[in-house]
């Protein structure tokens, strides 16, 4: 799915168009379509942290044209490491996508409102180890 970036992803302010697709049962990829060769690995935060909760500020809701009927998704960026358990998740800057109008924003959460969310949390803290 091709998406228009309505509010820049930090550090990638010139990127206006991205492609979002599923890699496997857990991970997704958000790839630049603006001639720049970069992408982000993403995960649905609720798969690993069911208590993840935040309010999308009005500004971002307006940019995305969100309302009660909007079909939308929330994803967080993962920095993949070896072994996978050493990978980190950024819960402090979720990416919100409006599937109805193919747009996205990165929401930067206020640390004073969300003191339990960090930009580099080990994924191993949220997944069960299977042996």
Swiss-Prot record:
One of its GO terms (cellular component) is cytoplasm. It is found in: Cytoplasm. Transmembrane segments: none annotated. Interacts with translational regulator CsrA and flagellin(s). Acts as an anti-CsrA protein, binds CsrA and prevents it from repressing translation of its target genes, one of which is flagellin. Binds to flagellin and participates in the assembly of the flagellum. NCBIfam families: PRK13282.1. This is Flagellar assembly factor FliW. It comes from Campylobacter lari (strain RM2100 / D67 / ATCC BAA-1060).
